[in-house]
Amino acid sequence: YWNDYEGTSAAYRDTAKVDAWDSSAALFLLVAERYRRAGGSVTPAITAAARSALGCVERVSDTDGLTWAKPDYRVKFLMDNVEVCAGLRAASGLFTASGHAAEAQQARARAERLAGRLPLFWRPERQRFSHALLANGNFAQDSGKPYPHGLAQLYGIAFVEAKAAAWEAVTRAFQPEAGPTAAFGPEWWLMAASRLGGADVQVWRARVVGDTATFLPTTYLQRHAL
């Protein structure tokens, strides 16, 4: 893992904190594989760092394949585990391209095992995705806040299963946020909406796309989502 930073590209500041081991390691793997796909060379140093990132994921993995946020923070977050699944798949591609077939297969198998557990976060009795599975085996109750509860619905729709009930709930309770501190920006809504159909969703999607076209270069976004 590594520490989080605050600020802008002109002035970053180390917070001396790390948010989560599992998603931090997954992010490195996603970036490394994206770098390779963009034409970058997979050097021995990158391969070694990818192995370290996988070791970090393993350190916080439970016997069911899901990951805890940190060794001393035993919560399995839906969003973190979606990111870990993507990171493991990225690692598989990275190791395949660099000629390490056995490690690629191991990463792929772990990703598929984890992916098979993600549907558990859908709670049919609530008609919602739970944002977290706790150490006592219970799923966390709804927080009623855009983050993490609202965003977890969008993650679940986009990356687990396109549940219409979750979409109806999130659009009824929340609106997209904007600004550099927003955790619930329109790009996440677009990713969820792209999994759904229907005239209402199409109208909503067209409106958000139109709003996005007005953004300035300085507007903060998760640009990969767009």
What role is predicted for each listed range?
Residues A53, A107, L114, V203-R207:
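Alpha-helical solenoid repeat scaffolds, predominantly canonical TPR units
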Residues Y5, E125, V170, M191-A192, ...:
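Enriched - but not universal
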Residues Y1-V60, L78-N81, L226:
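Aromatic-rich carbohydrate-recognition surfaces in CAZymes
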Residues V18-A38, K145-K163, L190-L226:
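C-terminal capping/lid segments that line or modulate ligand- or cofactor-binding pockets
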Residues A32, L88-A91, F95, A193:
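The core hydrophobic/aromatic register in alpha-helical repeat solenoids, strongest
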Residues A16-S23, S41-A48, R59-A69, Y73-A86, ...:
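Extended ligand-binding clefts on enzyme/binding-domain cores
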